[in-house]
Amino acid sequence: MIEADRLIAASGRDREEVQDRAIRPLRLDEYIGQPVVREQMALFIQAARGRNESLDHTLIFGPPGLGKTTLANIIAQEMGVSVKSTSGPILERPGDLAAMLTNLEPHDVLFIDEIHRLSPVVEEVLYPAMEDFQLDIMIGEGPAARSIKLDLPPFTLVGATTRAGMLTNPLRDRFGIVQRLEFYSDKDLATIVSRSANILGLVIEDQGAYEIARRARGTPRIANRLLRRVRDYAEVRGKGQITKAVADLALNLLDVDERGFDHSDRRLLLTMIEKFDGGPVGVDNLAAAISEERHTIEDVLEPYLIQQGYIMRTPRGRVVTRHAYLHFGLNVPGRLGEGADFSEAGDE
């Protein structure tokens, strides 16, 4: 199974990137949710503009689909400068990074997505650029090689990552501002869905927006994707209006249940319950039982189920919690009662 194949995948798709540009907020006052991040960034941006300086280098991290790219573009808009965008895997050689840095205007924003995937040799070039606004370039080869320094205009590097722990300490320490994006509340997601529907010219009721929001796994990207699919259903079977009933019918047809689980999520949970008595079960045994790769379970299926409290990792393997039994209307085993002891829970 490929993550991008799932309707509820948090990772982006090329076609969606184009579609999302039309509904992406451009200013902080249009940015919904993340109140602490929004207030802090408004303060930092106002201060930097008041001093006529570049904003400090900013690291944005959090799960995929929460708006890291959107926030980077908003920073550039609020600073009144241009943004140049790239990603860690694309910058294969120092020359690739040097070409982008030398084309920046004063105070511009350089946005690097998946910054944790920068190669070490490229990262070394980035250090003096971030710290001293200088670029060290080697001219020539062998004994005749020499290093020259090029001055760069002051700029703001905005790095985005889903895996902040994979950043090297020297790179992490060079960011003056670090922001973590959290999963969104259903209320904020419903506001995002209503806003997107309005931009797309759709008729949507508040309850219809909330029905989509509560199945979107706390992620705006998923909420907007579900909105587009519910729109298709509404146009064909619902007279073009998205009500709670229409959203419910559409999402049930799309196999996204009231908790935002799809077939793959439910199959994993039911396999653990029915074949392994709720666990503990090792991830390799679980992978064999559902015919999936180990990394698919660890990287694609498990994170949301763990975050929602349906699965726990213990020293002896994975176990389902009482919430999984309740979700399927099954009797909760006595060992998983209200006073169940998970004191030994941890990473397998």
From Swiss-Prot:
Q: Cite the residue spans of the region called Head domain (RuvB-H).
A: 258-348
Cellular compartments per GO CC: cytoplasm; Holliday junction resolvase complex
Which residue ranges are recorded for the region named Small ATPAse domain (RuvB-S)?
Answer: 185-255
Q: Name one GO biological process term.
A: DNA recombination
So which domain of life are we looking at? Bacteria
Question: What are the GO MF terms of this UniProt record?
Answer: ATP binding; ATP hydrolysis activity; four-way junction DNA binding; four-way junction helicase activity
Q: Which residues bind Mg(2+)?
A: T69
Residues holding ATP: I23, R24, G65, K68, T69, T70, E131, D132, F133, R174, Y184, R221
Record keywords: Hydrolase included?
Answer: yes
EC id:
3.6.4.-
Q: Which residues form a coiled coil?
A: none
Ligand binding (DNA): R294, R313, R318
Compartments annotated for it: namely:
Cytoplasm
Q: Catalytic activity annotated for this protein?
A: ATP + H2O = ADP + phosphate + H(+)
Record keyword DNA repair present? yes
SUPFAM superfamilies given in the database record: P-loop containing nucleoside triphosphate hydrolases, Winged helix' DNA-binding domain
Cite the residue spans of the region called Large ATPase domain (RuvB-L). 4-184
For this UniProt record, give its keywords in alphabetical order, as a comma-separated list: ATP-binding, Cytoplasm, DNA damage, DNA recombination, DNA repair, DNA-binding, Hydrolase, Nucleotide-binding
Q: Which NCBIfam families match?
A: PRK00080.1, ruvB
Q: Show the HAMAP family listed in the entry.
A: DNA_HJ_migration_RuvB (MF_00016)
User: What does the domain comment read?
Assistant: Has 3 domains, the large (RuvB-L) and small ATPase (RuvB-S) domains and the C-terminal head (RuvB-H) domain. The head domain binds DNA, while the ATPase domains jointly bind ATP, ADP or are empty depending on the state of the subunit in the translocation cycle. During a single DNA translocation step the structure of each domain remains the same, but their relative positions change.
Q: What function does this protein fulfil?
A: The RuvA-RuvB-RuvC complex processes Holliday junction (HJ) DNA during genetic recombination and DNA repair, while the RuvA-RuvB complex plays an important role in the rescue of blocked DNA replication forks via replication fork reversal (RFR). RuvA specifically binds to HJ cruciform DNA, conferring on it an open structure. The RuvB hexamer acts as an ATP-dependent pump, pulling dsDNA into and through the RuvAB complex. RuvB forms 2 homohexamers on either side of HJ DNA bound by 1 or 2 RuvA tetramers; 4 subunits per hexamer contact DNA at a time.
Similarity-based family: Belongs to the RuvB family.
What does the subunit comment say? Homohexamer. Forms an RuvA(8)-RuvB(12)-Holliday junction (HJ) complex. HJ DNA is sandwiched between 2 RuvA tetramers; dsDNA enters through RuvA and exits via RuvB. An RuvB hexamer assembles on each DNA strand where it exits the tetramer. Each RuvB hexamer is contacted by two RuvA subunits (via domain III) on 2 adjacent RuvB subunits; this complex drives branch migration. In the full resolvosome a probable DNA-RuvA(4)-RuvB(12)-RuvC(2) complex forms which resolves the HJ.
The name under which this protein is listed is Holliday junction branch migration complex subunit RuvB
Species name for this entry?
Answer: Pseudomonas putida (strain W619)
The gene is ruvB
